[in-house]
Regions:
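Hydrophobic residues in beta-strands and at strand termini
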Residues: 14-16, 66, 80, 123
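Hydrophobic beta-strand-centered segment that forms part of the acyl-chain substrate-binding groove
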Residues: 43-82
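Residues at secondary-structure transition points
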Residues: 23-31, 65, 69, 95
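HotDog/MaoC-like acyl-thioester-processing domains
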Residues: 70-71, 81-128
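Catalytic strand-loop segment that frames the active site of acyl-thioester-processing enzymes
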Residues: 1-27
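Beta-strand secondary-structure signal
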Residues: 11-13, 63, 75-79, 101-103, ...
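Hot-dog-fold acyl-thioester-processing enzymes
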Residues: 19-41, 54
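Short structured motifs
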Residues: 1-2, 60-66, 87-89
Length: 128
């Protein structure tokens, strides 16, 4: 669930539940990845919609590091909204594919980092 977003910061919250658990009593890694991806994608979607242009988005690559079991409430944060806005604008202005890397950090209720994700996005203005 997107819980906060502005031009620079986004937050997506994820609660440990039966449906997203793994056999080890924590949040399944792929569910964490979906929340992390959304925390980066929300900037791109917002700026594309604001531009009123058709722009395609594609994840080219992603990397993840898991530091602690994800239990309870986990919040994924991305603070690269300005970079995302610039990339969308460059894709529209140049008509060329633009790539950028956006990072999302997941923290638990104690503030400890449970996982970090980096997504490499490709943006390209669609031809009319």
């Amino acid at each position: 669930r997107v819980t906060r977003v502005d031009g620079l910061f986004s937050e997506v919250s994820l609660k440990y539940r039966w449906v997203n658990q793994n056999p080890f009593g924590s949040i399944f890694w792929a569910v964490q990845g979906m929340a992390a991806e959304l925390s980066t994608a929300v900037f791109l979607m917002f700026n594309i919609r604001k531009s009123k242009q058709a722009v395609s988005m594609l994840v080219l690559n992603n990397q993840a590091v898991f530091k602690k079991k994800a239990k309870g409430l986990v919040k994924f944060h991305c603070t690269q909204g300005a970079e995302a806005a610039d990339a969308v604008n460059n894709a529209i202005v140049t008509g060329q594919a633009v790539t950028l890397k956006l990072k999302s950090v997941g923290t638990d209720a104690s503030g400890d980092i449970v996982s970090e994700f980096e997504f490499e996005w490709s943006l390209k203005k669609k031809s009319s």
